[in-house]
């Protein structure tokens, strides 16, 4: 697959040959979905907690005698049916993470990249660098490229000036190539790869 390379100013800067094994697959939504669920489950803190009947601070003394009152038989006041009692089957601190084989995660990333390429949402930049770290300048460049919602992937290191200028622009994310992931690819309309990112991805998936 051949794709033209553009500059930040919107000018053509040649073309690049993309591997069909990475960008030319027929996207499988089931594999992509499994990876997204895995990512979102893993990022949950799992710190929610409610006290059960053994943990609430309240007397455990029997409320009243067993017989002779005409009332229902009750023991501890910590039981869930009373106000101030413990919660029945409440949330506890736990990990929400699920297992997903590494091969499936790698395959899902390939399918996500292929989905962007097939849908026309993939752009290749020659480089993501700015002479002066000015957000206003970068907004103008993005407007010319039609980038309202985009994930920008650079090489192993992101240019500090570019990252600083893009930081306050809504719906724009900038990541190094080692941070690329399925969820962030899908949540933005466009995927922008620099030539360095393309080379790194093809070396990674060899």
From Swiss-Prot:
The gene is rplD. One of the primary rRNA binding proteins, this protein initially binds near the 5'-end of the 23S rRNA. It is important during the early stages of 50S assembly. It makes multiple contacts with different domains of the 23S rRNA in the assembled 50S subunit and ribosome. Forms part of the polypeptide exit tunnel. Keywords: Ribonucleoprotein, Ribosomal protein, RNA-binding, rRNA-binding. This is Large ribosomal subunit protein uL4. One of its GO terms (molecular function) is rRNA binding. Belongs to the universal ribosomal protein uL4 family. Part of the 50S ribosomal subunit. SUPFAM superfamilies: Ribosomal protein L4 (SSF52166). It comes from the Bacteria. It holds the Pfam family Ribosomal_L4. One of its GO terms (biological process) is translation. It comes from Rhodopseudomonas palustris (strain TIE-1). One of its GO terms (cellular component) is ribonucleoprotein complex.
């Amino acid at each position: 697959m051949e794709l033209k390379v553009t500059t930040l100013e919107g000018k053509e800067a040649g073309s690049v040959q993309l591997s069909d094994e990475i960008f030319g697959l027929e996207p499988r939504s089931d594999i992509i979905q499994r990876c997204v669920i895995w990512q979102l489950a893993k990022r949950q803190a799992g710190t929610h907690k409610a006290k059960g009947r053994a943990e609430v601070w309240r007397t455990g003394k029997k409320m009243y005698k067993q017989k002779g009152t005409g009332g229902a038989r009750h023991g501890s006041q910590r039981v869930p049916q009373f106000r101030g009692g413990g919660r029945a089957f409440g949330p506890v601190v736990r990990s929400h993470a699920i297992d997903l084989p590494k091969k499936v995660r790698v395959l899902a990333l390939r399918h996500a990249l292929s989905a962007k390429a097939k849908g026309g949402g993939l752009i290749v930049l020659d480089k993501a660098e700015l002479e002066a770290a000015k957000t206003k300048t970068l907004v103008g460049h993005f407007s010319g490229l039609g980038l309202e919602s985009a994930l920008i992937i650079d090489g192993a290191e992101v240019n500090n000036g570019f990252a600083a200028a893009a930081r306050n622009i809504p719906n724009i994310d900038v990541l190094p190539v080692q941070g690329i992931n399925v969820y962030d690819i899908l949540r933005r309309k466009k995927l922008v790869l620099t030539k360095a990112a393309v080379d790194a991805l093809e070396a990674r998936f060899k």
